[in-house]
Amino acid sequence: MNIQTDAIQVSFGSKTILHDISLAIQDKEFVGIIGPNGSGKSTFLKCLYRVLQPSGGKIYFDGSELSSLSHRDTALKMAVVAQHSTVNFDFSVLEMVLMGRSPYKGLLDRDKIDDYEIARHALEQVGLSDFESRNFNTLSGGEQQRVILARALAQRTECLVLDEPTNHLDIKYQLELMTIVKRLDATVVSAIHDLNLAAIYCDRIIALKDGYIVCSGTPQEVLTAETIRHIYGVSAMVQTLPDGRLNIIYNME
């Protein structure tokens, strides 16, 4: 799925959070959004998945203006892994993942055999097949995050939006989650806190600071020592490994 944003602006009162964000994301491209806290990463993603209405500008999915789509049509096109997922009811893990099938059903429709097969396959993908009967609220933060990813995978959409998806995960599961997402036959837009993960998995990186796009390009183009200092205010050494990947080492000053 292609995504285009045209001069997106978000303001709360007199404070502007995003300034004229215009970009084009190509079908099946993995785009990482980086920047310090308060740079506008989550705000931009919330505009994509319709939690926030931009103060100005337009968003297009495959040429159709996002505001013209029903929420059901949006859910058939895009799944979301948000930063915080609060559940006030005692749902099982399998019930949580089955919620990803909701866009395909009527309000009173029951889950079908295919829905259960898709949900269980998603749990297998994230390594939680043995957890399906567990209460979601009893899981650790990292386990809950993997369940939320499984729910998004069960949605079977053309686009996946993730807001710092590796929060609460140890290194093994960070790599496993990002590898799963990278292998999807889908467009991926993800806010990423860890620049080394962004360097490994992203086709393109968009860097934000104070609500503005600072630069956009391949990891090699964006993740330079100069850009990291400008955006984050820290000194870093950027190494190119023999396989062409980047390794970022931060310096104490």
Predicted regions located by residue number:
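Helix-to-loop junction immediately C-terminal to a conserved catalytic motif
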Residues: 49
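Conserved structural motif at the start of ABC-family nucleotide-binding domains
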Residues: 3-5, 17-20
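The feature captures the beta-strand-to-loop junction immediately N-terminal to the Walker
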Residues: 34-36
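Catalytic Walker B motif of ABC-type/P-loop ATPase nucleotide-binding domains
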Residues: 160-164
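Conserved ABC ATPase "signature" region
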Residues: 98, 113-131
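Conserved ABC ATPase signature
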Residues: 110, 135-139, 143
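Conserved ABC transporter NBD signature motif
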Residues: 57-65, 74
